[in-house]
Design a protein with these regions (language model features):
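Short beta->alpha hinge that forms the Motif I/post-I loop of the SAM-binding pocket
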Residues: 103-107, 153, 176
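N-terminal auxiliary segments of SAM/dcSAM-dependent transferases
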Residues: 1-33, 44
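A short glycine-rich, Lys/Arg-flanked "PGG" loop and its adjoining helix->strand segment in the class I
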Residues: 155-167
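Class I S-adenosyl-L-methionine
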Residues: 10-24, 180-213
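Class I SAM-dependent methyltransferase Rossmann-like catalytic core
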Residues: 42-50
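A short SAM/SAH-binding and catalytic strip from SAM-dependent methyltransferases
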Residues: 139-152
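Conserved beta-strand signature within the Rossmann-like core of class I S-adenosyl-L-methionine
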Residues: 168-175
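Conserved SAM/SAH cofactor-binding pocket of Class I
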Residues: 53-134, 140-143
Length: 213
């Protein structure tokens, strides 16, 4: 694991399974062409102070991006969902699809489900990674992946979930350019997932990842 990267066992860190940090709830809004959402977040959850810059950039870009059509009844996923800003946006944008919001962090999962209920979204399923039915094939994945878990763990995570995309599926990721966005793009392309940068803004890259199976 890279130097100065917190250990996944750190009880205060967002990728801990059961963070022990005292609860400090905060509310924030997510606005876009698909409407306005009101969410809560908490200590021990990714972006505990509100909507983080990377996710904000990602949602702005994706609101205008011409994505391939998604068939009603499809499964979509947000890996590392945190409090649910991306997953809830997907649920609003694709009301006829089922959105899997996936996170190792139980506090994040609880808050994400609470946020979905609060916003009247019934097409979100919140799960820990190991709880997701391995037979499910996803039409698309949107994610602000947990870069700080370390390069090797991140590669393992992405390799696992990219393999679960449909044969014509697409993943969209946002990655800080100073935390390896370009090298990650090259790695995914070398892994036979052709990756294109569709936007670069405020220090973040938004990547489109295709399947070639």
């Amino acid at each position: 694991m890279p130097k100065n990267t917190p250990s996944p066992s750190d009880p205060q860190h967002y990728f801990s399974e059961s963070p022990q940090a005292p609860s400090r709830r905060k509310e924030f809004a997510v606005s876009g062409t698909d409407g306005k959402l009101t969410l809560s977040t908490d200590a021990g959850v990714f972006s505990q102070h509100g909507l983080d810059k990377g996710t904000s950039v990602f949602l702005e870009v994706m609101a205008k991006h011409d994505c391939a059509p998604i068939e009603p009844g499809s499964f979509l996923c947000d890996i590392g969902c945190g409090s649910g800003a991306i997953a809830l946006t997907l649920a609003v944008r694709y009301p006829a699809c089922t959105i899997y919001a996936v996170d190792t962090n139980k506090r994040a999962r609880d808050i994400c489900l609470e946020n979905a209920t609060r916003n009247g979204l019934t097409n979100i399923v919140v799960k820990a990674p190991e709880e997701v039915d391995p037979s499910i094939v996803f039409a698309s994945m949107w994610s602000n992946p947990p870069i700080r878990i370390g390069k090797s763990a991140l590669h393992d995570l992405l390799e696992l979930w990219l393999a679960r995309l449909d044969t014509d599926g697409t993943a969209y990721l946002v990655v800080n350019k100073n935390l390896g966005a370009d090298s990650l793009s090259q790695w995914m392309t070398a892994l036979s997932y052709p990756t294109t940068r569709i936007a670069s803004r405020n220090g973040f890259r938004v990547l489109e990842v295709k399947t070639t199976r």
